Structure formats: structure tokens, C-alpha cells
Amino acid sequence: MRALPKIHRRGPIECERKGLLVGKCWERSQGVPVARTLVEVARLAGVSRSTVSRVINDDPNVGAETRQRVWEAVRASGYQPHAVARSLVTKRTHIIGVVIPELVTALFTDPFFPILLRSATESCNEHRYQLMLSLFSSSADRQEMYERLVGNAYLDGVMVASAALDDPLIPDLLRDGVPFVCVGRHPDPRVRSVDVDNTGGARMAVDYLIRLGHRRIGALTGRLDTAHGQDRLDGYRQALTTHGIPFSEDLIVEGDFTEGSGMTGVQRLLPADPSAVFVASDTMAVGALRALRQGGVEVPRDIALVGFDDIPVASTIEPPLTTVRQPIGRLATLAVETLLDLIEHPGSGPRRMVLPTQLVIRESC
């Protein structure tokens, strides 16, 4: 197959100076025109206009060789398919939304979300989809977002991250038949979700502390109105039960996955005299370490800590944090792939996928 030579592009102003029609500007450099319409791409690829349209709109009946030839012409010429016109044909916008029911500050204080978004964006790019981010922290913001993006069919589908178990967004999406996937378990059996083994990971972490000789183990939980907050607490309880250690309410403090709640939470736990603490997120564990250091409590000499997530700071903080690693990047990729499958095959049944976790042993216990 003949390779398409490299081209040089000029901007609209330069085209106007040369008396060329802006919007249908053909230039030649090494014999290759810059295409601005389907007709021009068709001439460059040596096919009909309708064939170019079918390729751009992902018609499966176009042969592989022709499809490759057309996309080479599109890339070489710099042609940009018109998204609105394309959506009228395909009934799709090729945009999916990532909805995070959190304040904007969560993106800058909890590394989980940037890692998730980066991997989701990369996966969307691979499938020629765009990703739109929406954050809200109140019912009014949620309703405005829903009407503006989902209600007007602006999005082909939605990925919901870190939703509370009673978040009304989920029933709304189910009611309106919007393709969506949850990052994290949801109790409604109709909901597709991708998750990690939060219960098993927490159980593994607490079991490790018990095998080190700890019996009085505190738990600094995440938000207990979320599935992962509940599941990690369940794993903690299961480990205690397995080893015959009684569950004690005075060793449980609820946090909200923020560094600040880690600081205040561990301070509330100290009067109960734990020898070790399971912290349900690394971000909270960073706050706990800071509070303990300020109070003159040494880790792990005076108290042992284990976290959950294995975000980058876990390996660089002093002391390096023993933690449960969850594959955040893979979680995001699987969520996008699951959502796109649901968009392409609306009748496919809901299912839950769970990724394994791994205990990473460092120096905090």
C-alpha cells in the first residue's frame, strides 16, 4: 500500500492571504493536499465520499484495507470529522462522563481520583471517546448536572465513582435507561460495577497485624455510607473473629478518606490504647502519621499502622507505609471497557467484577 507523504499545514489567515477558501483549503507540500471535507479525503484515499463517511462512522461492513487507507488519509491531511454531524448519523456523541460526588478539592487532596482519571482518559482515547468530568457536592448541583448532561442526551454513558449507597443519582440513571457503571460495589443487582476486593484486602491487613502479635487493633474507617467504607470495616471484623479477638466499639472511629480525618481520627483512637491501627485509606494514614509525629508517638515503635490503596506517597513517607495495594489504573480501564460494552450492547446483563488486592509490607508495622 502506497504510504501517504508528510504534509505541511498553514493556518486560516495564511490561506486567506493566498486567496484560498477557508474551510475548504487545499494546500500542497510534497504532493499531498490538506483536506477539509469528506470529498477531499475521499480523493486523497482513492475512494468514494460515502465510503469515507462509513469508515468515520464505524460501519463494520467496510473492508480492513479500505478502512486503513481512509484513516491514513484522515491523519495525513488533518481532516477533523464534524462531531455534531457524526452524532446525528450514529445517534452517539462519543463522550462519556465521569461523575464524582465530591468537592473539587477532592481531586487535589486524594491521589486516588487523579490516578483513576488518568487511566480512564487513556482508555477513552484508545477507543476514540472523549471523557467529561463532573463533580458535585449537593443535591442542587447534582440535579443541574443531570439535566444539563444526562437529560439532554449529551453523554453516551456515565461512570460513577465513589457514590454513597443512597445517592439518588443511581436510581435516576436506572429510571432513565442511561448506560452507566459504578466504580465500587452497589447493592442494587441491576447495577453494573467494577470493584476491588475491599473486604479481603482489609482482612489480609489486619490478619498481618495479628500475626505480628497485636491484639488491640484500632480501625480508622472511611465513610460508612459508601460500599468500600463498609467493606473494609467488614474485613477488619472478619480478621478479628477468625483469631478469636472480640470486637470493641471504642476501637472504631469513622473518617471520610481525607488527610484531616486521619489526623483527628487517630487522636480520638489513642485514649483506647491500641497497639496498632488499620487505616482504611493511605490519605488518612498520612494524616494519622502526621498527628502521631506531632504528639511524640513513634511509628512503629509505639504504634503500628497499615493503610489501604498504595498511592505513590505510601512508599516515600517516613516511615514507608505498609498498605493494601489496589490496582487503581486497571480499575479505571475495566470501568471504561465495561461501560463501552454496555453502550454497544444495551441488552447485556449487569454484572459485578472484582479485582484482587495485595499486601505491600514496608516499615510502619
Question: What is each model feature region?
Answer:
Residues 2-95, 365:
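N-terminal helix-turn-helix DNA-binding module of bacterial transcription factors
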Residues 103-115, 133-142, 194-204, 220-267, ...:
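Hinge/beta->alpha junction and helix N-cap segments in small-molecule ligand-binding domains
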Residues 215-217, 247-251, 299-304:
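Short acidic capping loops at alpha-helix termini that bridge into adjacent secondary structure
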Residues 4, 8, 268-365:
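Flexible loop/turn connectors
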Residues 161-204, 245-246, 283, 309-321:
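Flexible loop/hinge segments that line or gate small-molecule binding clefts
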Residues 142-154, 262-272:
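Short, well-structured alpha-helical segments in soluble
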Residues 51, 91-106, 208, 216-222:
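Short beta-strand segments enriched in small/hydrophobic residues
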Residues 32, 79-145:
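Amphipathic helical "hinge" segments at domain boundaries
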